[in-house]
Amino acid sequence: TGLNPTFTSNQWKEYDTFFDWGVVSINGDPQDTWRTLTAEEWDYLIFKRPHAAALLGVAQVKKVNGLILLPDDWECPEDIVFTSGMSWNHGGYADYQSFTFEQWTSLELSGAVFLPAAGMRVHPYGVQQPTLRLDGIQTYGNYWSSSRDGNDAVSLYFDSIWVGISDIQIPSQGLSVRLVKEL
């Protein structure tokens, strides 16, 4: 992403400079420990790893809609029922499955990761400020990858019924970021 995460220009040339957020120290980890997944890594995680479809599911966690990702060697904690997959209903996160704070704590301790359906900051191409708005909060998630497709960026997109890679976004859109580190 760019060096200024709150920058809202709709001019492509303004986003030529890439900033490696991995140089920032997080929780005392050395610099260059954390990074953003590539589109290929998102694709592997969501679709291509063994048993990928069984290792993700939409849910509402503590009244927040989102997508849960599970590790390869995941074992479901006792007294928790996890249903993998997507809902057949638009906005059906809570109808599909819901977890309390205590249940989520147990899931998280077992390696589960939650991606909130945080929507995105929309800045329509060719339209001047102040047209910025937030869109899709609690409806869909859109997460940057570190991969480009020409002048655009590739992202992970999900809602309650669908998940996919290659949702192409112009750089002025404000998407969520999930940092990862090698273990």
Regions found by a protein language model. Give the residues of each.
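C-terminal, surface-exposed recognition/capping segments
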Residues: 23, 35-183
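Short, surface-exposed beta-strand/turn modules with glycine/proline-rich turns
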Residues: 1-32
